[in-house]
């Protein structure tokens, strides 16, 4: 018995050191007053020591951050990633057998499923965007190359690529591992210093500076304050480079053609990617229009937010990407952008819907807008109505109307048919919102606006 006790006393729990932490391992890092499991996405050696870029489990990516070993509790252990399975290679002279007739028929009739993309460790050749640049470009925006660390994307057939583009237009989900790491520390735009939320494919050298200075009019980017000040002395732009199509006593809207203002539109896409996680930037902005909302002062028109849309959308999308700059969020500008997009859709005599997927904040804003529009219409009607009639009056798609009614639990089955029913709670909540003073888009100020018409050559990607 005593021998067993001696043997147990010799058993020691494994102790870990900082050198045991590897890429993609999981550790317990201090966050919000307690230690939480976090995944190691990058390890860097700096002058002050080794730092780790971590993603906390069940947390949004915008909360990813750099931490030191002092924030990691090694006594709780390290969870290592599973080893990668070796790929099976066919030997020389071996030909794959043809599948049986039954298997061939099954493969034809079965619905196809797209496998999730896996990042490759190979480095692609440097790629540059095609098309001519705008006049007046500078060293800060001559080209927008992908970062060297960018991984080679999966090879897709023409049909798969078209389907992927059609699913999300100008932007798609970014499958690359490098895109999981926020590469810009801080940006300075106007009087505001902002910490970005996500990765954006700015040139590599900008990830090595403390602050990236961005012009609030042309959105050119610089790595030093001196370069930025020299640019401001020469920059003559005081508003977005397009036509002002809407103006009231509060805001203005400018319409910009991506084909005519490539550099400006690319710069605004790079900036917006810092605050959008679910989408990846395409450098060819030719097939898109940009509608920019600005506030005016004695210095010019300052961008508050914008949305882009395809010049021609086969799915009737009236919006490709939407963003309110962080310094202007929670002031009601998002709803103004959404309302303006639907006002344009009404002038086009169409039904519209935003491209999917929406960001988390975008989805919240759209659901609130849809709910307000539908409840307002239903409460104001004295006769029976249908989903198609609601869609026609709001320029929303029938799917969006149906989704909103279901989300609000307004569809009830009564005497063999579905009816629209508003509960007392929803009506009271709507009355409270109605009493709040909020700015709205005046559709009458768009009476002179005509939907732009484009030649087929102006609608294709030019890369």
UniProtKB/Swiss-Prot annotation:
Enzyme class, UniProt record, top EC level: transferase
Motif (ESA1-RPD3 motif): 262-283
Gene Ontology cellular-component annotations: chromatin; NuA4 histone acetyltransferase complex; nucleus; pericentric heterochromatin; site of double-strand break; Swr1 complex
Domain Tudor-knot: 22-74
Keyword Amino-acid biosynthesis tagged: no
Annotated region (Disordered), positions in chain: 76-145
Biased composition (Low complexity): 111-121
Catalytic residue positions: 355
EC number: 2.3.1.48, 2.3.1.-
SUPFAM superfamilies: Acyl-CoA N-acyltransferases (Nat), Chromo domain-like
GO MF annotation list: chromatin binding; histone acetyltransferase activity; histone H3K4 acetyltransferase activity; histone H4 acetyltransferase activity; peptide 2-hydroxyisobutyryltransferase activity; peptide butyryltransferase activity; peptide crotonyltransferase activity; transcription coregulator activity
Bias (Basic residues): 87-99
MYST-type HAT domain: residues covered: 179-451
Binding site residues for acetyl-CoA: 320-324, 329-335, 359
Family, as annotated: Belongs to the MYST (SAS/MOZ) family.
Free-text comment on this protein's domains from its UniProt entry: The ESA1-RPD3 motif is common to ESA1 and RPD3 and is required for ESA1 histone acetyl-transferase (HAT) activity and RPD3 histone deacetylase (HDAC) activity.
Chain's role: Catalytic component of the NuA4 histone acetyltransferase (HAT) complex which is involved in epigenetic transcriptional activation of selected genes principally by acetylation of nucleosomal histones H4, H3, H2B, H2A and H2A variant H2A.Z. Acetylates histone H4 to form H4K5ac, H4K8ac, H4K12ac and H4K16ac, histone H3 to form H3K14ac, and histone H2A to form H2AK4ac and H2AK7ac. The NuA4 complex is involved in the DNA damage response and is required for chromosome segregation. The NuA4 complex plays a direct role in repair of DNA double-strand breaks (DSBs) through homologous recombination.
Record's subunit section: Component of the NuA4 histone acetyltransferase complex. Interacts with arp4.
Protein name per Swiss-Prot or TrEMBL: Histone acetyltransferase mst1
Organism: Schizosaccharomyces pombe (strain 972 / ATCC 24843) (Fission yeast)
């Amino acid at each position: 018995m005593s021998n067993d006790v001696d043997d147990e006393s010799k058993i020691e729990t494994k102790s870990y050191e900082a050198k045991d932490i590897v890429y993609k391992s999981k550790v317990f890092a201090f966050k919000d007053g307690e230690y939480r499991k976090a995944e190691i996405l990058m390890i860097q050696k700096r002058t002050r020591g080794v730092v780790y870029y971590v993603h906390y489990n069940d947390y949004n990516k915008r909360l990813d951050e750099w931490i030191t070993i002092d924030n990691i509790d090694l006594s709780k252990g390290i969870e290592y990633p599973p080893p990668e399975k070796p790929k099976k290679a066919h030997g020389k002279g071996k030909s794959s057998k043809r599948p049986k007739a039954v298997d061939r028929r099954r493969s034809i009739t079965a619905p196809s499923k797209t496998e999730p993309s896996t990042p490759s460790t190979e480095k692609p050749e440097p790629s540059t965007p095609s098309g001519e640049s705008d006049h007046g470009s500078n060293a800060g925006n001559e080209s927008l190359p992908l970062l060297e660390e960018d991984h080679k994307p999966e090879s897709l057939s023409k049909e798969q690529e078209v389907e992927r583009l059609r699913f999300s237009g100008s932007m798609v989900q970014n499958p690359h591992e490098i895109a999981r790491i926020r590469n810009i520390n801080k940006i300075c735009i106007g009087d505001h210093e902002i910490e970005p939320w996500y990765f954006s494919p700015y040139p590599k050298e900008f990830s090595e500076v403390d602050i990236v200075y961005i012009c609030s009019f042309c959105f050119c980017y610089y790595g030093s304050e001196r370069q930025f000040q020299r640019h401001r002395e020469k920059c003559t732009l005081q508003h977005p480079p397009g036509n002002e199509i809407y103006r009231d006593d509060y805001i203005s809207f400018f319409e910009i053609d991506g084909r005519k203002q490539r550099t400006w539109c690319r710069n605004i896409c790079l900036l917006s990617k810092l605050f959008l996680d679910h989408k990846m930037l395409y450098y060819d902005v030719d097939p898109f229009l940009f509608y920019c909302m600005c506030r005016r002062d004695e210095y010019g028109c300052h961008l508050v937010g914008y949305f882009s849309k395809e010049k021609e959308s086969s799915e009737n999308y009236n919006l490709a990407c939407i963003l309110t700059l962080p310094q202007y969020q929670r002031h009601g500008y998002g709803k103004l952008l959404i309302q303006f997009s639907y006002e344009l859709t009404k002038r086009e005599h169409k039904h519209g819907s935003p491209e999917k997927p929406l960001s988390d904040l975008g989805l919240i804003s759209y659901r609130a807008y849809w709910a307000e529009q539908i409840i307002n219409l239903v409460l104001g009607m004295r006769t029976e109505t249908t989903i198609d009639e609601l869609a026609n009056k709001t320029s929303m798609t029938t799917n969006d109307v149906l989704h909103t009614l279901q989300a609000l639990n307004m569809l009830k089955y009564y005497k063999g048919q579905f009816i629209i029913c508003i509960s007392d709670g929803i009506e009271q909540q709507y009355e409270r919102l109605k009493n709040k003073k909020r700015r709205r888009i005046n559709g009458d100020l768009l009476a002179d606006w005509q939907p732009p018409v484009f030649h087929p050559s102006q609608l294709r990607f030019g890369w």
